[in-house]
């Protein structure tokens, strides 16, 4: 977290709620439970949703992909409920899954009462929790960007135009999404995401007095992050030397980092990053590929920021 203010205050999220709705839809899509070209039949209940909508009719059929577009671009309440019913049988059952997922993500300030964000007693979350679900969505389901970055589009073969409620998509460099919301009681909210130079930031603004103000505040937060922080790739200070293997078909094994390491640091602090390599001595065959041989400890100005396992890059059999 680069900056926060009243981040744990429980407030109404309005349609920013739909980030969780989208997360559950994307999880179902990416796990193969449903497909983008599945056709969904709209119920009378879904068609009767008030607020922002795409005027779905009872019995109308629309693909999962089109409904996703309706939810991300124009925040269609009717589309959100149609998808909730398609996935879970009823909105109530879907909301139970939303709350379960919120618990799993550590969203302690959150209670969902519906999948749309329409005003309801006890339907609350915090800026902190919105950031958590936003991160989960963009990190693990990057294809959501295909929808959240749409500025203008249409459905029903061009008969119904869609323009994104998120102005940043059109007017902020690197904007990738994510979701706006507004009601009379929640006022104006947004979870805004943007990426520059491989670094993606999330800015959450709640209870802003005007629509323009929420975008200005989100822009200021993102600008602050991009101006002051950078993502630094970390490599070992010295090359990883081969490790001796006793009784092996080869005398050595080459160690490698198990994963890449990137650290978020203040600009100008890149020089304060250092690494310490801890490697096993006297390794005895057999050695499995991927077997842990040690670790690289990464510090910034003496403070440990990450520990990356070091593993064997190949298998070494035992001499027979």
Language-model features, listed with the residues they occupy:
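Active-site-adjacent loops and short helices of periplasmic peptidoglycan-processing enzymes
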Residues: 1-141
């Amino acid at each position: 977290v680069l900056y926060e203010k009243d981040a744990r205050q429980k407030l109404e999220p309005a349609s920013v709620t739909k980030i969780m709705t989208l997360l559950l839809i994307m999880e179902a899509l990416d796990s193969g439970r449903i497909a983008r070209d599945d056709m969904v039949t709209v119920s009378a209940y879904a068609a009767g949703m008030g607020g922002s909508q795409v005027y779905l009719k009872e019995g109308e059929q629309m693909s999962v992909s089109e409904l996703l577009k309706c939810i991300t671009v124009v925040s269609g309440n009717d589309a959100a409920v149609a998808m909730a019913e398609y996935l879970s049988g009823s909105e109530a059952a879907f909301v139970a899954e939303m709350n379960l997922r919120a618990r799993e993500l550590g969203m302690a300030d959150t209670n969902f009462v519906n999948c749309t964000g329409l005003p309801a007693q006890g339907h609350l979350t915090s800026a902190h929790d919105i950031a958590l679900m936003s991160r989960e969505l963009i990190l693990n389901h990057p294809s959501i960007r295909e929808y959240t970055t749409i500025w203008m589009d249409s459905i029903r073969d061009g008969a119904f135009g869609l323009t994104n409620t998120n102005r940043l998509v059109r007017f902020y460099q690197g904007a990738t999404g994510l979701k706006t919301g507004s009601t009379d009681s929640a006022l104006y909210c947004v979870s805004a995401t943007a990426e520059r130079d491989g670094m993606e930031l999330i800015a959450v603004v709640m209870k802003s007095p005007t629509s323009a103000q929420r975008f200005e505040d989100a822009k200021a937060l993102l600008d602050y992050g991009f101006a002051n922080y950078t993502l630094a790739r970390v490599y070992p200070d010295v090359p990883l030397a081969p490790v001796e293997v006793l009784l092996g078909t080869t005398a050595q094994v080459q160690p490698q980092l198990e994963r890449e390491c990137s650290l978020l640091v203040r600009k100008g602090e890149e020089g304060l990053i250092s690494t310490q390599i801890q490697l096993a001595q006297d390794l005895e065959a057999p050695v499995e590929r991927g077997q842990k041989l040690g670790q690289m400890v990464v510090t910034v100005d003496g403070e440990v920021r990450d520990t990356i396992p070091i593993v064997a890059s190949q298998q070494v059999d035992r001499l027979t």
